[in-house]
Amino acid sequence: LKLIDEDFFAGLIFHRVIPGFMIQGGGYTKDFKEKHCDSIKGEFKSNGVNNELKHTEGVLSMARTMIKDSASSQFFIMHKPAPHLDGEYAAFGKITEGLDIVDQIANVPTNFQDCPTTPVVIKTIRRA
């Protein structure tokens, strides 16, 4: 929430888009410069935290490397359910309005690395 309050995400892009799975953003500018912030403890079951939120359509979750406590600003939004992520990634919220926008982003043209061919830029993120 601190990053939202600081408008950290304004101007960043969704850099990984996989239809039928998820859209990922929060770490790069349009010209692929990485925007850094501190990492946090991964709040999910296999890391010792009881988090029962399932990775269903519209759920927000923290992106990370294979290192469990490497999550920072990158997040992903589930386009479709992915139960194999349950207990392994820190789900923390759910889109309640605007799932049509998630569908639109999930279906933009991408290159061979699942990166949109035209940048999908985040204008701002606000608390509900």
What is the predicted function of each stretch?
Residues 1-128:
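Cyclophilin-like peptidyl-prolyl cis-trans isomerases
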